[in-house]
Amino acid sequence: MPEPSVAHFYDELADDYHLIYADWDASIRRQGDALDALIGQERAAVLDCSCGIGTQAIGLALRGHRVTGSDLSPRAAARAALEAARRGLRLRTAVADMRRLPFADGQFDTVVCADNSLPHLLTERDVHAALAEMRRVLRPAGLLLVSTRPYDDLMRDRPASTLPQVHQVADVEGGERTVTFQLWHWHDGEHYDLEHFQLLPANGHWRVRVRRTTYWALGRDRLTSLAAGAGFVDLGWRMPQETGFFQPLLVARAGM
C-alpha cells in the first residue's frame, strides 16, 4: 500500500487508538515491563521506530529507558509525545519512514518495532530496507525487537475477521461501551486488506468509524531470513507465553 495511505490510516486512528484497550495505562505498563525484561539493561537508549501513540515507548520510558519514538503518522507521533508529557515523561518523537530513519549510525542500544508494524511493508525489498536502517542506527551487538501477528498460524485458516472487542471506557460518554473489530480481505496468497471498525457511543446512537489499510502476512522463517540478510545475528523467536508480550517477538543482535 502506498505510504500516504498507511500514514492516513494511523492519522485517522490516532485520537481513538487507546479505545482498542480495556485499560490503556495497564497495557502500557504490561508491554513496557515485558520489553524491559528482554532489554536487560538500565537506561538503554531505545528507538521505537513505529511508536504510534506511544504504547510501548511510554512503557519503556516508565522503566527508566531513554526513548525516542518515530512514526510515519504525524498525528500519532504528536500524541505519543503529548501522552508521555502528561505522565511526567520526556519522549522525543519524529515523523519518519522506518526505511529512512533520521538518526545517526550506532545511536541506539535497542530498536523496537512492535504491534505488527513492519508488515505494512508489502515487499521483501521494503522490509529489507527497513531492517537495514534498524541495523544502521544500532550500536554493534545492539538489540532488535520486532513483533508481528502469529502469521504462521493465521495463514493456515486465513480468517475473515477478528472477534469484536467490547470495552467499558471511562473517557467515552461517561463510561459507555465501545466496540472494535476488523474485517480481513485476502486478495492473494499472503497479503490482505484490513478494515478497522470502531463503534463509539454518541447521544444514544452509534457513531461508526472505518479505516482501511493493507498488510503482508509475513511468516517467522521469512522474516528471520530477511533480518539475517540485513546484518542481524543470534536471531530467535520468543512467544507470548514466555515473554508476557501479546505478540511473537523476533529477538536479534546487530552483527559486528
Each language-model region and where it sits:
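C-terminal lobe and adjacent flexible extensions of AdoMet/dcAdoMet transferase-like proteins
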Residues: 214-256
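A short acidic, Gly/Pro-enriched loop at the edge of an enzyme's catalytic core
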Residues: 99-110
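Conserved class I S-adenosyl-L-methionine
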Residues: 1-44, 55
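A short SAM/SAH-binding and catalytic strip from SAM-dependent methyltransferases
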Residues: 110-125
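Class I SAM-dependent methyltransferase SAM/SAH-binding core
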Residues: 54-100
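A short glycine-rich, Lys/Arg-flanked "PGG" loop and its adjoining helix->strand segment in the class I
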Residues: 128-140
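Conserved beta-strand signature within the Rossmann-like core of class I S-adenosyl-L-methionine
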Residues: 141-148
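SAM-dependent methyltransferase
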Residues: 148-220
